[in-house]
């Protein structure tokens, strides 16, 4: 699942960059910029859907990766497991900042 995580992360970064090129965060124009992305940008609706659904698939892959680590007893490798827990917390904080706060 590590390779799927890498693929999901690369897809999220690319689609996020493409969406950020057309998005404005001003309170009066934010909704119209999303409408602009979906209607006027070539395949903007597809980029937006890939970005939204890719985030869900990314977390599914993370949970499967953690489940595999639990099944095979990888938690016995303390340093590696703790780094993974820190990475999971960072990913969850980033998702909160990117989804809830805007």
Swiss-Prot record:
GO terms for cellular component: mitochondrial inner membrane. GO terms for molecular function: metal ion binding; ubiquinol-cytochrome-c reductase activity. PROSITE patterns: CYTB_NTER. Disulfide bonds: none annotated. Heme b b566 binds at residue 65. Its main location: mitochondrion. One of its GO terms (biological process) is mitochondrial electron transport, ubiquinol to cytochrome c. The chain crosses the membrane at residues 1-21, 45-66, 81-101. Heme b b562 binds at residue 51. It comes from the Eukaryota. Its cofactor is heme b. Binds 2 heme b groups non-covalently. It is a multi-pass membrane protein. It is found in: Mitochondrion inner membrane. Keywords: Electron transport, Heme, Iron, Membrane, Metal-binding, Mitochondrion, Mitochondrion inner membrane, Respiratory chain, Transmembrane, Transmembrane helix, Transport, Ubiquinone. It holds the Pfam family Cytochrome_B. The keyword tRNA processing does not apply. The cytochrome bc1 complex contains 3 respiratory subunits (MT-CYB, CYC1 and UQCRFS1), 2 core proteins (UQCRC1 and UQCRC2) and probably 6 low-molecular weight proteins. Component of the ubiquinol-cytochrome c reductase complex (complex III or cytochrome b-c1 complex) that is part of the mitochondrial respiratory chain. The b-c1 complex mediates electron transfer from ubiquinol to cytochrome c. Contributes to the generation of a proton gradient across the mitochondrial membrane that is then used for ATP synthesis. Heme 1 (or BL or b562) is low-potential and absorbs at about 562 nm, and heme 2 (or BH or b566) is high-potential and absorbs at about 566 nm. Belongs to the cytochrome b family. This is Cytochrome b. The lineage of its organism: Eukaryota, Metazoa, Chordata, Craniata, Vertebrata.
């Amino acid at each position: 699942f590590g390779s799927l995580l890498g693929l999901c992360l690369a897809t999220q970064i690319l689609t996020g960059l493409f969406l950020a090129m057309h998005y404005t965060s001003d309170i009066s124009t934010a909704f119209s910029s999303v409408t602009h992305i979906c209607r006027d940008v070539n395949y903007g609706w597809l980029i937006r859907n890939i970005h939204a659904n890719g985030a869900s698939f990314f977390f599914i892959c993370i949970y499967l990766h953690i489940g595999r680590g639990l099944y095979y007893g990888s938690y016995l490798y303390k340093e590696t497991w703790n780094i993974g827990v820190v990475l999971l917390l960072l990913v969850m904080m980033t998702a909160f900042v990117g989804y809830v706060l805007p």
